[in-house]
């Protein structure tokens, strides 16, 4: 479980329509992180963005884009990130991965989370 102190925040940028085999890339990554014992991860869907092709994809009332930006993000120890990075690179496909040093000032507790729910 993630503790307070130095950690790494990993952001994986994908296109909404990207797939790993037959599954959405973000779902494959989230499943892998869950099975790997990561404390928590989130998936964020953007309303507009562009990638290396420099073509802007955005939500419009006329047509919904299937190439909107999606970001999977989690924070974990350097050792755990190093352990997972090879598989994450495979699952991200043509997406990009960004890693930033960060400091966790308050880590979630399973006991407290269970009591709140």
Residue ranges and their predicted role:
Residues 1-117:
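Positively charged, small/polar-rich N-terminal and surface patches that mediate targeting and assembly
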């Amino acid at each position: 479980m993630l503790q307070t102190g130095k950690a790494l925040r990993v952001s994986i940028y994908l296109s909404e329509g990207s797939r790993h085999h037959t599954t959405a890339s973000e779902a494959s990554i989230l499943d892998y992180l869950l099975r790997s014992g990561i404390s928590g991860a989130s998936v964020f869907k953007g309303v507009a963005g562009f990638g290396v092709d420099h073509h802007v994809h955005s939500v419009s009332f006329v047509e919904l884009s299937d190439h909107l930006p999606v970001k999977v993000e989690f924070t974990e120890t350097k050792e755990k990130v190093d352990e997972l990075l090879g598989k994450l690179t495979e699952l991200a496909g043509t997406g990009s991965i960004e890693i930033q040093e960060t400091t966790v000032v308050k880590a979630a507790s399973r006991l407290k989370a269970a009591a709140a729910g």
